[in-house]
Regions:
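N-terminal pre-ligand scaffold of iron-sulfur
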Residues: 1-65, 94-118
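Iron-sulfur (Fe-S) cluster-binding segments and ferredoxin-like electron-carrier domains
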Residues: 59-64, 76-82
């Protein structure tokens, strides 16, 4: 697998209206069990995890530099999930992608089922 998160019994959840997501725009979502960002690039919609792969800190989108930033260790990712800058001994992993679709003007992400309490 290419690092894709493929939930076995997830469900499609609405994260944005297609009309709200302009070309190149980034929209954050939080469904409880999963949080991330959707982006439209060249007409296609992509969704990446909004949680840093290093220690699970919540990322925020910095529009001025078009990057997802981690407040914990100054790591930043491209909206496609690739590491742009980091100050760690080893680069963190790229952000996982979610299955995403646009249907009837609605953008939906395949959210994993709520996790069992550990």
């Amino acid at each position: 697998g290419g690092g894709e998160l493929v939930p076995t019994d997830g469900q499609w959840r609405q994260v944005a209206a297609g009309a709200d997501l302009a070309e190149g725009a980034v929209h954050s979502f939080d469904l409880g069990s999963v949080a991330g960002f959707v982006r439209r690039t060249q007409g296609r919609v992509e969704a990446v995890s909004g949680v840093c792969t290093h220690q699970g800190c919540k990322l925020w989108f910095d529009q001025s530099v078009d990057q997802l930033r981690c407040p914990c260790h100054l790591t930043s990712f491209s909206p496609a999930g690739q590491v742009v800058t980091h100050a760690l001994p080893n680069a963190p992993k790229p952000l996982p992608h979610f299955d995403v679709r646009e249907r009837d003007g609605v953008i939906e992400v395949l959210a994993p089922p709520p996790s069992e309490p550990a």
